[in-house]
Structure formats: C-alpha cells, structure tokens
Swiss-Prot record:
Lineage: Eukaryota, Viridiplantae, Streptophyta, Embryophyta, Tracheophyta
Major subcellular location class: plastid
Biased composition (Polar residues): 1-13
Gene that this polypeptide is encoded by: CCDA2
Protein name listed in UniProt: Cytochrome c-type biogenesis ccda-like chloroplastic protein 2
Pfam families: DsbD_TM
Transit peptide endpoints, chain numbering: 1-63
Length: 362
C-alpha cells in the first residue's frame, strides 16, 4: 500500500508558513540504513516519518496560535489600560463635581455666613469693650472706637441709611466739597451729642440703658415700626392741632446749614439708638456704675465717633454721589425705601429683644 505524499492544505498566517514549509520540505538527512528521503514513499519506516511530520505540524500550529493571540493580548491590555484610565478620570471628575457642588452649597449659604460673621463680630466687640472697661486707657478708647465701627455695620443701621444718604445729598447739592464735609461733621456731632447726653444722664441717674429692662428697647423698636408704616403710607400719623400752623422746614430754613445738619443729627441719633445695643448698653451700664459724667461723656463720644466714621467717609463723596445718582430725581423713592428699612429694622430689633439668641454657630 503506497503512502500518500504529505501536502499542506491549511491556510496559515505569514509567520507560520516558514515553519510549516520547513516541516513539509524533504529532509536530506537519512536514517541509518535507510538512505531515503522523508517524503519518499516507503514501506518500512513510513509510520515514523508520518509521526515526525505530524509533530512538526503541531509545533508550527502552536507557534502560529501564539502569534495570532499576541495582537489579541496587546489589544486586551490596551483596552484594560483605557478602562483603568477612564475610571481614574471619572473619579477625578466626580471629585471635581463634588467640589463644585460644595462651592455651590457654600454660595447658597454665604448670606447666612456673613450674617453670622457680623453677629459674632458684634459680640466680640462687646466682650472687648467689657475687658477694656476694667482699666481705662488710650487702648480702651481705641477699642471703643473700633466697637463703634463694628456696630455701624449691623443690619439695624440700614434702617436709617437711606434717610442719611438722602439728607447728605440734599444739603450737599450745589455746594463745594469743604461745605459738604463741614455739614456732615455737624451732622455726626449731632449723633454723638445725643448718645453722649444719654451717657451723662445714665451717670446721674445711676441706671443703664441695658438695666432698665425690656421697656426702652422695645419702645424704640415699636416706634421704628410705626414710623416705617407711616413712610409706607400704611398708617397716617396726625399731629395735634396746635402743630398745624407750624412748619419745621420754614423755621429751619432761617438757620445756617451747619446748624440744620446738627439738629438733623440729633434726631437721627434717636432713631439709630436701638441699633447700638449691646455695646451701648455695656457702655451706659459702666457709666451708670462709675457715676462720673466726664468719663461717661468721653466714652460715649468716642464710641459715637467710630459709629459715624462711615458716614463721614460717605460725606466726603457726597458731591460725587449727588452728581452720579441725582438724589432729587429719585426723591419719590426715598420715603418708601426708608419706610421698608425702618420697618424691617424695627421688627428685627423687636424680635431680637423679645427672643434673644442664646447661641450662634458659625
């Protein structure tokens, strides 16, 4: 029985062909005693030749399979790297989104944070004043001056700010810078005088603004609410009949502008006095216990100077504000805006006195 010559019918990749060709090429080396080629049919030893050829084929197929699997292995590694990189990027993006959401939450609570900051600053100013009152010095006066600055930033102060700016714009119209600043100083002195008189009165009476109970602060807050409603034209206040023929503007028109500003400052101090607690209550309490009018007047004057310092800064630019904002053109809005702030400030201070906050978390 003649053996069929070995032929390759399997399609292989290019790297596999040399190995397979080598396996199918006739061998020039002969086995001992045979002297024939591997591919030549023979009766004896044919099984050995077929086994050798089969082994060569299997080896070539194994090599080809490794070569074929290598691109798949590289592709698998590449895909795995991309997946890992994508996961890392997703983690970074997630962290950035969490950070941005945290910033958004911080932006949403910035109003509360700023309000808590002002409240904490006021409390710390009050504590600093209490510490400095134990031993008066020039440092004590500087601390009290700074406490006045902090108090001027309280929300309650906004209730009189539109009226103050409107008045500054009114008496600053058509006047030079020096006259405007002089009138503003007179206005501030009117504020300081009222609070200094309160200090002197407390020293003589032996009672403090903060020691007379809830009556005076609540009454002042209620007055602010009533005046705010009046400016908003919700309620109408009627003066007694003997004031019907009296025009305060006509009477004040005959006075110098600085005197008018001073008198206006006296009036504005009464409206702003509820905004000065608790620092003012601490000062007046100390003045009442010391029973020294000179010390009382000096401390209150120092405090009020710091309290009106922002007003003096605003007065320095009163002429520019007058030309840029044209207060007279928008004078119809002054009363409603002032009424809204007075109403809001009055309600705020009233609730603060009736329901004082025991703790404030930053």
């Amino acid at each position: 029985m003649a053996a069929r010559p070995v032929s390759s019918t399997t399609s292989t990749c290019r790297p596999c062909r040399p190995a397979q060709a080598a396996a199918s090429k006739p061998s020039t080396s002969s086995s001992p005693g045979t002297g024939v080629l591997v591919g030549v049919p023979r009766e004896r030893g044919s099984s050995v030749s077929k086994a050798a050829i089969r082994g060569a084929r299997l080896e070539a197929a194994a090599r080809c399979s490794l070569v074929r699997q290598r691109p798949m292995l590289l592709a698998t590694v590449a895909v795995g790297s991309l997946v890992a990189a994508g996961a890392a990027n997703a983690t970074e993006i997630g962290d950035s989104l969490l950070g941005s959401s945290g910033l958004a939450l911080a932006d949403l609570s910035i109003g509360d944070w700023f309000g808590n900051l002002l409240y904490s600053a006021g409390q710390q100013a009050n504590e600093a004043v209490q510490d400095q009152l134990s031993a008066l010095s020039f440092t004590s006066l500087a601390v009290i001056f700074g406490a006045g600055l902090v108090t001027s930033l309280s929300p309650c102060t906004l209730s009189v700010l539109p009226l103050t700016l409107g008045y500054i714009g009114a008496f600053g119209s058509g006047k030079d810078r020096s006259e405007v600043v002089g009138n503003s100083v007179a206005f501030s002195l009117g504020l300081a005088t009222t609070l200094a008189i309160l200090g002197v009165a407390a020293s003589f009476a032996g009672k403090a603004y903060g020691q007379v109970g809830q009556g005076l602060p609540v009454a002042a807050s209620g007055l602010a609410v009533i005046m705010g409603l009046n400016l908003l034209e919700v309620i109408e206040l009627q003066l007694p009949s003997f004031f019907s023929d009296y025009d305060p503007r006509a009477a004040a028109a005959n006075l110098p502008s600085s005197v008018q500003a001073y008198l206006a400052g006296l009036t504005f101090a009464l409206a702003a006095s509820p905004c000065s607690t608790p620092v003012l209550a601490t000062l007046l309490g100390y003045v009442a216990t010391s029973r020294d009018p000179i010390v009382g007047g000096s401390l209150l004057l120092t405090y009020t100077t710091g309290y009106v310092a922002p007003l003096l800064i605003a007065a320095s630019f009163a002429g520019a504000l007058q030309s840029l904002l044209s207060f007279r053109r928008y004078s119809a809005w002054i009363n409603p805006i002032s009424g809204a702030f007075l109403l809001g400030g009055g309600v705020y201070t009233l609730l603060d006195r009736l329901f004082p906050a025991t703790s404030m978390v930053m």
